[in-house]
Amino acid sequence: GALFSALTVMENVQVPMREYLDLPKKLMDELAMLKIELVGLPPDAGRKFPSELSGGMTKRAALARALALDPDIVFLDEPTSGLDPISAAEFDELVVKLRDTMDLTVYMVTHDLDSLFTACDRIAVLGNKKILVEGTIDDMMKSEEPWVKSYFRGKRARQLDLAARA
């Protein structure tokens, strides 16, 4: 995973702080706890090691570390991969909440149609070493590009009722 297994969650969140900031330990502890709570983890999660966390908690801890330096841009690579549908939906909601409240730009690489529909306001579909289509979910639904059409209007999309939007 994205976390260092030999470090607690709090220590993981502090890694970028130690690397790029010169702050007293007490302040780093406070900032790390703030980020841990910001992503919806309980305060005691800071004392746990990654192996003691559920999949959803691990994803949240990694997100807390990504937010440690208050970035303007966050990159997420398959953030809901390996999560059950309920945890994935909760993570998508968290991403949207953080994006909106912190005015973040979020670049998300995902194959999860639910995540695309819930958390993304613009999408770029990559194929054949280029961007096939770029735009809103509505643009994807109207696209006549064969791969995009199959992906957004195929069987899985119909199960999500995305195809009804076309």
Question: Positions of the model-derived regions?
Answer:
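Helical segment within the ABC ATPase nucleotide-binding domain
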Residues: 89-102
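A short, surface-exposed alpha-helical micro-motif characterized by mixed small hydrophobic
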Residues: 116-118
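Conserved ABC ATPase signature
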Residues: 49-53, 57
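Catalytic Walker B motif of ABC-type/P-loop ATPase nucleotide-binding domains
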Residues: 74-77
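Conserved ABC ATPase "signature" region
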Residues: 26-44
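A short, proline-enriched helix->beta-strand linker immediately N-terminal to the Walker B motif
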Residues: 68-72
